[in-house]
Curated annotation (Swiss-Prot):
One GO term (biological process): thiamine biosynthetic process
Keywords: Cytoplasm, Schiff base, Thiamine biosynthesis, Transferase
Catalytic activity from the UniProt record: [ThiS sulfur-carrier protein]-C-terminal-Gly-aminoethanethioate + 2-iminoacetate + 1-deoxy-D-xylulose 5-phosphate = [ThiS sulfur-carrier protein]-C-terminal Gly-Gly + 2-[(2R,5Z)-2-carboxy-4-methylthiazol-5(2H)-ylidene]ethyl phosphate + 2 H2O + H(+)
Organism this protein belongs to: Bacillus subtilis (strain 168)
Name by which UniProt lists this protein: Thiazole synthase
Annotated compartments: Cytoplasm
Positions bound to 1-deoxy-D-xylulose 5-phosphate: G159, A185, G186, N207, T208
Function of the protein: Catalyzes the rearrangement of 1-deoxy-D-xylulose 5-phosphate (DXP) to produce the thiazole phosphate moiety of thiamine. Sulfur is provided by the thiocarboxylate moiety of the carrier protein ThiS. In vitro, sulfur can be provided by H(2)S.
Oligomer status and interactors: Homotetramer. Forms heterodimers with either ThiH or ThiS.
Gene name for this UniProt entry: thiG
Pfam families: ThiG (PF05690)
EC identifiers of the protein: 2.8.1.10
Consequence recorded when altering K98A: No activity; no imine formation with DXP
Top enzyme class: transferase
Residues annotated as the enzyme's active site: K98
Length: 256
């Protein structure tokens, strides 16, 4: 299976894993290990990165094994997102940032205008920018024209578990993109993750599907296998859909 490359950095795993809302640090740590993810994302606002006296999941990890992807969750304007990104960079953990600017507190859908503004500013400041966006094909193109390093369209609303609601739009985004497309948000099961990869996505980012499962550790392994299977299927090339059946056995020797 080919490697994932973002901003000049290559990764073996195409599964990006979120680190929020696990039942315990121990379960979180085990799920991360089982997933074999190379990239872990976390909300800067929820991590006590400058508070040594407060519990911090990052302290439980061997950070030499992972690339950290801070996100700007909680931001509702470009200015807030930029401020959070600068805070993450000041911690010295990573220069990659997932831009997340929410425009609707109920649906948790991203604000397209503020996402564009934040992405443009952070690119000017030298960040490796991965914006979370909707499945709007034109918006994805405009983000790429800005120079972002990956596009992260949502499959469905964050944490909804509804899976891929608009595979056609995702296919259009994947087809036009010259940067990696990471399907982000709404993944509910390994089936959804495999489907995203079969569509040609370069990776999948998920959190709640694992952290909210009855057994997060088992689900983390299931997601790992699903992403691998979906990518291998895409690279192998599926058979075309046909209206009628085609025999797989040879026709020679059959009675006429």
């Amino acid at each position: 299976m080919s490697m994932l490359t973002i901003g000049g950095k290559s990764f073996q795993s195409r599964l990006l894993l979120g680190t929020g809302k696990y039942p315990s640090f121990d379960i979180q740590k085990e799920a991360v290990a089982v997933s074999e993810s190379d990239i872990l994302t976390f909300a800067v606002r929820r991590m006590n990165i400058f508070e040594a006296s407060q519990p911090n999941f990052l302290e439980q990890l061997d950070l030499s094994k992972y690339t950290l992807l801070p996100n700007t969750a909680g931001a509702s304007t470009a200015e807030e997102a930029v401020r959070i990104a600068r805070l993450a960079k000041a911690s010295g953990l990573c220069d990659m940032i997932k831009v997340e600017v929410i425009g609707c507190s109920r649906s948790l859908l991203p604000d397209p205008v503020e996402t564009l503004k934040a992405s443009e500013q952070l690119l000017e400041e030298g960040f490796i920018v991965l914006p979370y966006t909707s499945d709007d094909v034109v918006l994805a193109r405009k983000l790429e024209e800005l120079g972002v390093h990956a596009i992260m369209p949502g499959a469905s609303p964050i944490g909804s578990g509804q899976g891929i609601l608009n595979p056609l739009n995702l296919s259009f985004i994947i087809e036009q993109a010259k940067v990696p497309v990471i399907v982000d948000a709404g993944i509910g099961s390994p089936k959804d993750a495999a489907y995203a990869m079969e569509l040609g996505a370069d990776g999948v980012l998920l959190n709640t599907a694992v952290s909210g499962a009855d057994d997060p550790v088992k689900m983390a392994r299931a997601m790992k296998l699903a992403v691998e299977a979906g990518r291998l299927s895409y690279e192998a090339g599926r058979i075309p859909l046909k209206q009628y059946g085609t025999a797989s056995s040879p026709g020679e020797g059959l009675p006429v």
